[in-house]
Amino acid sequence: MRACLICNTSATVENYARVEAQEYVRCSRCGLIFVDAIKPPDKLYHAYDGGALKAWRRKLVAPWRGFTHVRNFDQSMARAKRIFDFVTAQKQTLPPHPNWLDIGCNKGFLLATAAAQGWQVYGVELVPELMQPFQRRFKQFAHNIFSQRFIDVQTQFNNDTFDVISAIDVIEHFEEPRRDLSGIYRILQPGGLFVAQTPDGAAKQAETLKERWGALKPLEHLHLFNAANLEIFAKQLGFTEIKFFPPFEAADGNLVAVMRK
């Protein structure tokens, strides 16, 4: 079995659930739930693109789709505004032109919301077609969008660059969370915030449903934290203050973490 990335040992790791012929294990010391054998990157990314037919259709439509021409656009923008308001309420002081990086920015609704309030925005999104309408609509930020893994993109940013970094429903996808979160810490400004929503490995569903828990997706959700072990992990990386909040919406037992550098 793989070692727990927080406790740095495999001695405390035990079987948890078997999903789609893959084993999830759990650390008996800290409670981290994780996929024991992570598939190669090409297998993981195939899960994100939705398969050949869906990917082909998305590539065909993307050059013609407008930023607002998506299903449930108003609801998506309302959700982005709720997240933006929550995050900015946690950040008391800001420079004149603050910088916001959204990892896993999807179609760019949160970035559009921040841009409308004067932020300089940057995004990381593995599926490039999703962000093309945003890039056409917000041409001034078109070159701030990166279609790579964050672990590969982060080397392009200087230390102490961002006032806020968000990762909504993302950190569970990280293949190497220690490298990814270390990169996030490095490029945050002193006093900057990292805001993440992620499935809660201590949620009631984790015990009552186990393999039927919707958060268990072995090609996508590779590491499932809980509040206690995520706080330990964040402090190992240097974050000085970690707070937890209810999720932005109820889904499979999520939590929201706010970490301050």
What residue spans do the PLM features occupy?
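A structural motif corresponding to the C-terminal end of an alpha-helix
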Residues: 233-239
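Short N-terminal helix/helix-N-cap motif within the alpha/beta-hydrolase-1
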Residues: 175-179, 206
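Conserved N-terminal segment of class I S-adenosyl-L-methionine
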Residues: 1-160, 164-168, 178-182, 245-248, ...
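Short, solvent-exposed loop/helix junctions and linker helices
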Residues: 21, 174, 221-224
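A short His-aromatic
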Residues: 169, 173
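Short, glycine-/aromatic-enriched active-site segment of Class I SAM-dependent methyltransferases
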Residues: 196-223, 228-233
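A short glycine-rich, Lys/Arg-flanked "PGG" loop and its adjoining helix->strand segment in the class I
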Residues: 178-193
